[in-house]
């Protein structure tokens, strides 16, 4: 296989590699859509004391497939007075922008589709496509409810995009890089204590709230508030084109959760199978107090496989997916718990509270980074800095 690949010209290798990466990203996006949709339906049923889907497949786990087939075969109805091209293209722009985020998500050491040096800037650029898709859908539908939803959505997305980017700047300052893989490596120095969640707790909270608004998730789903706007910019869509918006929404949810896990929870960092086996072997051997044949065998096996790239990649994917779906669960929990806010409350929260708080976080991070030079140049949090300052003064 490698001989055949090496026999190809560099141009063909680039093209085939691009097609393979795009195909894998598309499949991964659809897998996340399936998992998120099923998890949403099960969690909502659990929180509302219902059973949820359980008839189609084992415990209802094929229900999302049945839903997609139903929407695929539904009659396509396009109103006569729509702007044809804007109306048709909008769902696909939203779907493509959702999948583009996965291009720069690192799943392991060198396990990444495209390791951009300006990964954070790429994320900010991709966010702009959501605004375009939302406004195109509202304008192209030529419907008052769609237009109102699109205007709300555009204002909301633009406002919270600024806040989200400002919240991430603190992480960039601590890592010293815009590359997501470098941000993960910067969090590996002290295990989970090195996660940026702790020194960047302010930025994390701001990012979490802003991402819910960016994803148009409750309690910030004002662009499609059913009680006010029928379905917002989705009003005139039906069948599979409506399903494209739903695909984009859930793929976006998983993608932004993966970004949060990468920025604040160490990304793919975590114990590998070899490290777990070696640790278990040390426990069975009493940490050197005595020798146990089983413990020695487990220890040697763990040390032997600790250098396996494939197993380390599997462990990286496992930890990233686990952390990602922690955020997915959190977003769904919030959706089915909190009531929807008003549009004026949403805008006030973004511009008058979250944006100033994120700017304060940048100032605080810069100050602590500057003062940390006096304490061996170690990135520090507010609490650890206070303790070190007291120790230095005393």
Swiss-Prot record:
**ATP-binding listed as a keyword:** no
Subunit structure of this chain's protein: NDH-1 is composed of 14 different subunits. Subunits NuoA, H, J, K, L, M, N constitute the membrane sector of the complex.
Q: Per its UniProt record, what PROSITE patterns does this chain match?
A: COMPLEX1_ND1_2 (PS00668)
State where it is primarily located: membrane
Q: Does the keyword rRNA-binding apply?
A: no
**Stated family:** Belongs to the complex I subunit 1 family.
Give the membrane topology, semicolon-separated if more than one.
Multi-pass membrane protein
Q: Give the UniProt entry's GO cellular component terms.
A: plasma membrane
InterPro entries on file:
NADH_UbQ_OxRdtase_su1/FPO, NADH_UbQ_OxRdtase_su1_CS
Q: Where in the cell is it found?
A: Cell membrane
Reaction(s) catalysed by this chain's protein: a quinone + NADH + 5 H(+)(in) = a quinol + NAD(+) + 4 H(+)(out)
| Spans through the membrane | 19-39, 85-105, 118-138, 157-177, 192-212, 245-265, 286-306, 314-334, 346-366, 371-391
Which GO annotations describe the biological process of this protein?
aerobic respiration
The UniProt GO MF terms for this protein read:
NADH dehydrogenase activity; oxidoreductase activity, acting on NAD(P)H, quinone or similar compound as acceptor; quinone binding
The EC designation for this entry is 7.1.1.-
The name this protein carries in UniProt is NADH-quinone oxidoreductase subunit H 2
Q: Which organism is it from?
A: Symbiobacterium thermophilum (strain DSM 24528 / JCM 14929 / IAM 14863 / T)
- What are the entry keywords? Cell membrane, Membrane, NAD, Quinone, Translocase, Transmembrane, Transmembrane helix, Ubiquinone
Its biological purpose is as follows: NDH-1 shuttles electrons from NADH, via FMN and iron-sulfur (Fe-S) centers, to quinones in the respiratory chain. The immediate electron acceptor for the enzyme in this species is believed to be ubiquinone. Couples the redox reaction to proton translocation (for every two electrons transferred, four hydrogen ions are translocated across the cytoplasmic membrane), and thus conserves the redox energy in a proton gradient. This subunit may bind ubiquinone.
